[in-house]
Amino acid sequence: MDDALPRHPDTTATLLLCGRFGDSREGLKPLSPSEFRDFARWLEARRIALGDLLHKDAKSIFRNYAKTAPLCERLGALLRRTDDLALARERWAGLDIWVVGQFDPGYPSRLRRRLGFAALPLLFGAGPRELLDGGGICVVGSRDSSPRGLEFSRLLGARCGREGMTVISSDMRGADREVVGAALANNGKVVCVLSDSLEKALAAKRYREPLAAGMMAFATPFSPEVNFKVANAIRANKYQYALSDIAVIVETRQTGGIWLGADENRNEGWVPALVRTDDVMPSGNLALLHLGLAPITRQDVKDCASVRDFFVQRALARGRGAADDRSAPAARPAGPHPLPPTATASFDLYAVFVAELRRFAATGPHSDAEIAAHFGLDIEQTRRWVSRAVAEGAVHATAAGVRAG
């Protein structure tokens, strides 16, 4: 498949500098994420594109950048790995694996916007890449989730599948695999973020049909053949949150990757998050409730008229609560890089609003008052967001009201 091949020169250069393929000679290591970040920023400051390294006098560029001769020689040797890259590209194409670099126009905009250089330089995957920019619900849970947690995952996945909400999770056994399977079984779409073994996942019989039907996409920031590492699993968590509109934590302890991912999302403010509550639940779930995450129960998922509307209402309600908290006088921790919580929360909630507005407008036209009632928003906030959505082309304003674009 041609789409598997890195067409953009920036991606080709990134692969040569950072990719792990071919026979690694001792002493020739691909750039680490931090090394690549520093080099990319240096190039950007001088208005040199990564792809220019394939055509211009790269040696002079390396000499200007590298502080030592060994580093200059290493950069040059990495760029000369074209034969090894050609073989790797041929292998990936045979498996329908695509790859994009951070500076490729085809790199998912949500990852670029939310993670920036916190993301790894390359993204591999398979299936329709456009699913990665379509948003959805991130669902994460423990490998050893309880029977109640697994039942909740199946129920949530089934409802998301039936109602057209993309599920963003992983192929990890337990809650993640259950929610993915239930969504696919109900004709839903899935984005599966992997921390290892993309090649093995593509060979799994359970995913062949949804991949062929365009109902599923895999994505991983790691080489397709890489084996499982705990550190990689923790690093992959942020991708699930960053690709989504809202997140649900099914089960977590107060340690481990699921906990760290939930805490990182809470600190970074990528998306609103809810945590499953029950009569009996893990200590991590209870701790997340105490930290301010919204609750979600099995009955909520089972009884709500629309799971999409339920999530929109919860996200907007938490956003209003956070805004109220921020309006009260409070001591601010000192630091060189304070977070801008207002802008972050506002953007994420607006993304949720627009996603639902498109669906609601398809049943229109609807007036601003009808939209405000549908979302439970005050009329002024509704008008601001509707005006922005119209300006961005997400919906159309007519004399009769707002219609789908």
Over which residues does each language-model region extend?
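Helicase-primase coupling helices
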Residues: 40, 57-60
